[in-house]
Amino acid sequence: FAERGATLPMTFGHEIAGIVEAVGGDVTTVQCGQQVLVFPWIGCGNCDACHEDRESDCSAMRIIGLKQKGGFASHCLVEHEKFLVDIEGLDAADVVPHSCSGITVFNALEKMGALRKNEWMAIMGCGGLGMNAISIACAMGFENIIAVDIDDAKLDAAREMGAAKAMNSQRRDAVEELQKMADGRLMGVLDTFGGAVTGRIAVRAMSKAGRYLLVGQAGGDFHMPQVWLPQKAMTVRGSHVGNSPQLRKLI
């Protein structure tokens, strides 16, 4: 946490849901007693990104639970009503992960853009981010999803979540197998793990004009010939959490 800017003393906890107990005099869209989900990725409030509700693009974020006191407490102060999302009638325990993992993959999937009926997307990693990505991708209308992991039990769960196909990437021919499963039309890869192996597989398996979206932060380096970027017309892009309107849209 220190590497991300946290200093002690600090109350952690960035996935927060609760009941509004008090509001300021200028608040008009939130009422006391309302059940809400907190958007924790608050920006500086002064830059162009913040003025355009693109808080995750702010270079001086003041994240609740990291740079502001978080949710591991009886009360949490939220500075503006736009950072609260109404979740009345929903199970808070089911909804609260969407303020982190949910909005992260939702933002990346929106950046991915639509795919044609004969095009495929691979979701690398079937942990919390990956499973959320599969579920949300299906809800967004993506149909041709290939789940990729090294754990067969997770791959079985990914199929149940909605993945059309699944592949264990420990196969020595992982790149060729992934291309085959996508019928030569792997146009998108969402990497929720973010390690050297997943990056290497992704950029080699993608078809021309494919899009590689990285949200996982396992760390490491992967290498590819620089000439691939123009010759394969590929997009390699990072994506970091999301913005407050996206969380409201996701919920």
Identify what each model region corresponds to.
Residues 176-179, 183, 219-251:
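C-terminal substrate-binding/catalytic core of Rossmann-like NAD(P)-dependent dehydrogenases/reductases
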Residues 36, 89-172, 176:
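Mid-domain Rossmann-like dinucleotide-binding core that forms the NAD(H)/NADP(H) cofactor-binding site
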Residues 119, 210-211:
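Glycine-centered, small-residue-biased loops immediately flanking beta-strands
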Residues 3-9, 44-124:
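NAD(P)H dinucleotide-binding glycine-rich loop of Rossmann-like/cofactor-binding domains
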Residues 206-207:
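Helix-to-beta-strand junctions that scaffold the AdoMet/dcAdoMet cofactor pocket
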